[in-house]
Amino acid sequence: MTQDDPENAWPITLAALTTGLNRPSSRFRMRQYITRLAEHGVNVQEHIPFIEKTCYFPGPLKAIRHIPGLFRSRNADLVWLSRSFVKGYETFERFLKRPRILDVDDAVWLGRPLGRFAVPDIARSMDAVIAGNTYLAEYFGSYCNKVYVVPTAIDLDRYKLCSQALMESREEFVIGWTGTASNYKYLKNIESVLARFLREHSQAEFMLVSDRCWEYDLLPPEKVRFVMWDREKEVSALHSMSVGIMPLADDKWTRGKCSFKMLQYMSAGLPVIASPVGMNREVLQKGDIGFAADSPDEWYEALTTLYGDRSLQIKFGQAGRKVVEQFYNADTIAGELADIFKAQLSG
């Protein structure tokens, strides 16, 4: 389909090939835009493998599960692929209708078998790549002529700002962390700092929101609260926190992360403490939103400063919310995505 007159030829139909309903890469990079894109003349038809509509399915059927979506996508004007399509080996990518666009929010060439060999070939077979940050864009720019940087955005209609009254009335100082259990290794790097802080501050506690408990070694158990992740309660869980933390190692994999934990905390009006790695550093530079912490002493100092200053917590939290509204708002990002999709048909 060629759009000779872009102003009058829309709407267009976009086939979105995604994965399980709770997979973050599908939820926040693609699915949350379906309604918003329709407002910009892009009608999205999402194709979720039947076997993954409620759960993630590992194993050898990873490639075969996408075949029905591949055939159904032939009726669309263009195809939008979740990064879950990148397995570290080529499967059906070359058989998809063109234009085809790959969305990536992780350094997928590092975490897959044979990824550093196959991912470049997959990227070359794409007409465009949408990357979650500049680090990813630089990599894919070596293999695809059209690469766009589009950050993972926040649905501000859903992620409400925690009320100032609640922040001011809370007696406990709740250090919050949310994420999948696979990322507990980054918490391990600051476990000794957390343990010391929790023991030395009577009103402090640590709140974990995840899919599985963390088997920590040093934390005082009476100061740790585990909350099983629940899609319907993920926002209210943020409102129970005083500060959100995002510790990371500094390596090629973490530089590909898109700072989504930080953005979730900020959308709720929480101050943040984060390792200044990759996109985290970029987000920290956009406002007076919290602290960068690069050593045990810096983590301890940041926690201590916020613990003793409720007004600073609120100040940082409000500034963080404004940064999200300005730079990471799903309503705004939807317009950027629509322009990208239309450009593939009008060029």
Regions found by a protein language model. Give the residues of each.
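Acidic anion/phosphate-binding donor-loop and adjacent secondary structure
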Residues: 2, 110, 154-172
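C-terminal alpha-helical cap of glycosyltransferases
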Residues: 4, 330-347
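Membrane-proximal helix-turn-helix segments that form the acceptor-binding/catalytic region
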Residues: 66-74, 89-95, 106-129
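Carbohydrate-associated surface elements
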Residues: 135, 153
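Nucleotide-sugar-dependent
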Residues: 185, 231-237, 242-267, 274-282
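Conserved acidic donor-binding segment of nucleotide-sugar-dependent glycosyltransferases
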Residues: 286-297, 305-311
